[in-house]
From Swiss-Prot:
It comes from Xanthobacter autotrophicus (strain ATCC BAA-1158 / Py2). This is 4-hydroxy-2-oxovalerate aldolase. InterPro entries: 2-IPM_HCS-like, 4OH_2_O-val_aldolase, Aldolase_TIM, DmpG_comm, DRE_TIM_HOA, PYR_CT. GO terms for biological process: catabolic process; L-leucine biosynthetic process. Mn(2+) binds at D18, H200, H202.
Length: 344
């Protein structure tokens, strides 16, 4: 089930999945339904819902969710008459069994995510999704960490397993527009014409929209965004602002801009217990090239051990830590605290 309208950009909302990170995975069902209803009425193409770290991400390592994935998925599915219900799956966290449960709960699209050098672990999940008849896209996360040519090699693997779309995923919000252009163009040249390319950006260097536009102009046909930028770190490309920019550029999205503005201000911003914005901590994520969902974990560790969040993030970047290594955040904080005590 690939993108139905080949003449229109595919708008994938991630407010209820990436936005989970901003709320420590605590969306209640009433808010979930209200946001999904508003997005569906605004005519976005797809709405992603699951724990921030994907199916079965509710763990000690990543943070426990307010509900299980099936409850969230069913709540969104009940509100959608237009948008496709989408889930995220990271091999090693979620399983094929979890994907089948998500399908039973109402999901009809999945993004299978791996680190940018580990596409080979995605095969069974991609094949299972295709067997279920799901729209099957993939993420190559932390895409800033390898050159475009190496990223294209990984994308070809995902394509060979059955991926219908491969996303250039800037998990750290570290890429510049020219970096996005190079990666999308390289993938476009490497993949079959029918294999689509998507862009998933973060706003840590305030480039979420600029990078999305650069990716679209380079050949991407799917784009992720979230209401009020609700997502990990400084958030994703703000959906309402992105649609305004695309409207100005004459790019058809089919979305109701004012309805998205209203949903961002009336439904999403009031939920934020920590503002989703570019500040000294979230800016440090993009500058150091650190996985955006590390932010709140690093802030907790900084408070516990009396060190600067920026120092933790900088050291994580120096050590080239990636998603799944959240346990190392405390180790880094302890190392910094010990070094600080030694010179006191």
């Amino acid at each position: 089930m690939a993108r139905p309208n080949k003449d229109k950009l595919y708008i994938q909302d991630v407010t209820l999945r990436d936005g989970m990170h901003a709320l420590r995975h605590q969306y209640d069902l009433a808010a979930t339904r209200a946001i999904a209803r508003a997005l569906d009425r605004a005519r976005v193409d797809a709405i992603e819902i699951s724990h921030g770290d994907g199916l079965t991400g509710s763990t000690f390592n990543y943070g426990f969710g307010a509900h299980d994935d099936a409850e969230w998925i069913a709540a969104v599915a009940e509100e959608c008459s237009h948008a496709v219900v989408t889930v995220l799956l990271i091999p090693g966290i979620g399983t094929v069994h979890d994907l089948k449960h998500a399908y039973e709960a109402g999901a009809r699209s999945v993004r299978v995510c791996t680190h940018c050098t580990e596409a080979d672990v995605s095969r069974q999940h991609i094949e299972a999704a295709r067997e279920l008849g799901m729209d099957t896209a993939t993420f190559l996360m932390m895409a800033h960490m390898i050159p475009p040519e190496a990223l294209a090699e990984q994308a070809r693997l995902m394509e060979s397993y059955g991926a219908e779309c491969v996303y250039v995923t800037d998990s750290a919000g570290a890429l510049l527009p020219e970096d996005y252009t190079a990666r999308v163009k390289t993938l476009r040249d490497a993949l079959r014409p029918e294999t689509e390319i998507g862009v998933h950006t973060h706003h840590n260097l305030t480039l979420g929209i600029a990078n999305a536009v650069a990716g679209i102009e380079a050949g991407a046909v799917r784009v992720d965004a979230s209401l009020a930028g609700m997502g990990a770190g400084a958030g994703n490309a703000p959906l309402e602002a992105l649609i305004a920019v695309l409207n100005r550029k004459g790019i058809d999205t089919g979305c109701d801009l004012y309805a998205l503005m209203d949903a961002a201000d009336d439904l999403v911003r009031p939920l934020q217990d920590r503002p989703v914005r570019v500040d000294r901590e979230s800016l440090s994520l993009g500058y150091a090239g650190v996985y955006s969902s590390f932010l709140r974990h690093a802030e907790n560790a900084a408070q516990t051990y009396g060190v600067d969040t920026r120092e933790i993030l900088s050291e994580l970047g120096r050590r080239r830590m990636v998603g799944g290594q959240e346990d190392m955040i405390v180790d880094v904080a302890l190392d910094l605290a010990e070094a600080k005590a030694a010179v006191a």
